Amino acid sequence: MEKRERKKIRVLAGGVFDLLHVGHIHFLSQAKSLGDELVVIVAHDETVRMQKRREPVNPAEDRAELLRALKMVDEVYIGSPGTIDYELVRKINPDIVAIGPDQRFSCERLKEELRKHGINSEVIRIPYLYKEDRAKTSKIIQRIVETYCE
C-alpha cells in the first residue's frame, strides 16, 4: 500500500520583534509547536512608528535577519507599512495564525477579517511566558534607561 504524504501544517506569526528577548523566543517556539513550518512577518519600521509611537531600536531588515537565524523559524518576511498585509498572508497561506498575548485584536475578530480576505486559517493566542510583563521590549528599554542613563 502506498504511503500518503501528510500535508505540512504552516503557522504564521507576526510582530515587531525589536530587541529580541525571552518572551519572543517563547512566543515563537509555542507558535512552531502548533505545526510543522513557522513563517514570521516582521512589522515594517513605519508600522512600528504608527503602533508603538516610537522609532524601532533595530530596523526591520536587522530584526528579520535575527529571526532567520533562529532554528525554529522557517521563513521571514517584512510586512508592508500600516496594518495587516492580507495579500502577503494569502501568499503564505497559513493553516494557523498565532498571535501574541500583547496583540490587541481578538482571535474571533482576526479570524473574521482573514475570512473576508479569502484566508481560511485558525487563529490561536499564545499566552505570556511570565505573569508579570518583564519580558516586554518596552520594559527592557525602561530598565536599561533606569540602570545606565542616570
Curated annotation (Swiss-Prot):
Transmembrane segments: none annotated. GO terms for biological process: FAD biosynthetic process; FMN metabolic process. Its cofactor is a divalent metal cation. It is an enzyme of class 2 (transferase). One of its GO terms (molecular function) is ATP binding. Gene3D superfamilies: HUPs. Pathway: Cofactor biosynthesis; FAD biosynthesis; FAD from FMN: step 1/1. It comes from the Archaea. Keywords: ATP-binding, FAD, Flavoprotein, FMN, Nucleotide-binding, Nucleotidyltransferase, Transferase. Pfam families: CTP_transf_like. It catalyses: FMN + ATP + H(+) = FAD + diphosphate. Its EC number is 2.7.7.2. InterPro entries: Archaeal_FAD_synthase, Cyt_trans-like, FAD_synth_RibL, Rossmann-like_a/b/a_fold. ATP binds at V16, F17, H21, V22, G23, H24, D102. Homodimer. Belongs to the archaeal FAD synthase family. Catalyzes the transfer of the AMP portion of ATP to flavin mononucleotide (FMN) to produce flavin adenine dinucleotide (FAD) coenzyme. This is FAD synthase. It comes from Thermococcus onnurineus (strain NA1).
